[in-house]
Amino acid sequence: MGLRNLLDKVEHHFEKGGRYEKWYPLYEAVDTFLYRPGSVTRTTAHVRDGIDLKRMMIIVWLCTFPAMFFGMYNVGHQANLIFAQSPDLLGAQDGWRFALIGALAGFDPNSLWDCLVQGAAYFLPVYLTTFIVGGFWEVLFATIRRHEVNEGFFVTSVLFALTLPPSVPLWQVALGISFGVVLGKEVFGGTGKNFLNPALVGRAFLFFAYPAQMSGDAVWTSVDGFAGATSLSLAAAGGVDNILGHGLTWMDAFLGHMQGSMGETSTLAIFIGGAVLLLTRIASWRIVAGVMLGMIAMSYLFNAIGSTSNPMFAMPWYWHLVTGGFAFGMIFMATDPVSASMTDTGKWLFGALIGVMVMLIRVVNPAFPEGMMLAILFANLFAPLIDHFVVQANIKRRLARNG
């Protein structure tokens, strides 16, 4: 018996009046994940594109793969570089992860396999925890409300996991995604009704609730007893010269050969996935362009103002592009169609607001060198207001034109 036949055979048990009626959302989630939805229109439909929510979310999920796999490689590569430079640290490591890594691979920084295995030993448990805990809340709320489980959580789960440092405790991962899904989305009605990006809500909660595990110099590698600063922290401490002084070139930063959150280091990998999102029109090019233009304009403004005490004023825009979570946030977070502005003009303004805000936070705030997360959440709050004024301006313009 094929899987399709098996699902069809048990379907009546989950429908209204069936033995497992209350579990229909779970059945529907499995069925639509494995096969296309069976619902059809009852009357003539005017379809511009056959894409549905399921296909859209799966495309976004697949577009994170370049950043995901490079992130796993880079986590392992950074750790193995440290072990090669300080062999004594290798003997000080313990735990189930290192037992697993030792059984499946080695600690050679020049071995692709060794680096991937080490990175996977840190990323996959984080992703699995995110998926299981967040999925539990999705299914619970869908069951209570008696509606289908949406595929949007596939995207939320992977984006949340990719924004975390490799050393984050798994219980904090569970707590963060619970906060993001429940208070960032479900309390407002679920998929399509949230005004904040749930992945960023969860990440912001962890940042403010557990700053010791989300920031500083000791959280960006998987090596216990080692502290290493991110490129953005180096820039905040001494500008671009400080970054270059630590042996990190712009090309290294662009390719992602540096410490940072698991999925945010490689601008190249992020742009590969972003190109697909833009070509398929899932992501709005207006938002991406607005973020870039806002960031570049503010960067030139700060460069012109200058500062003798704050080296971030002199940092060029192309360094801001490849440091921190700017590229990841611009491509995957800012373009969330639910929490972003919906009008064309509003998308430009929404993106520009993010670009301006991230520069203000990075440059002017000495205690917080990264600003993309807060900039996007700030813009999410203003997205409805931006659309309101754009619509009102359009109404006034049409009234003036047509009398």
Swiss-Prot record:
Cofactor(s) of this protein: FMN
Catalytic activity: a ubiquinone + n Na(+)(in) + NADH + H(+) = a ubiquinol + n Na(+)(out) + NAD(+)
One Gene Ontology cellular component annotation held by this UniProt entry: plasma membrane
GO molecular function: FMN binding; oxidoreductase activity, acting on NAD(P)H, quinone or similar compound as acceptor
Keyword tRNA processing carried by entry: no
Subunit relationships: Composed of six subunits; NqrA, NqrB, NqrC, NqrD, NqrE and NqrF.
Protein name stated in the entry: Na(+)-translocating NADH-quinone reductase subunit B
Gene that this polypeptide is encoded by: nqrB
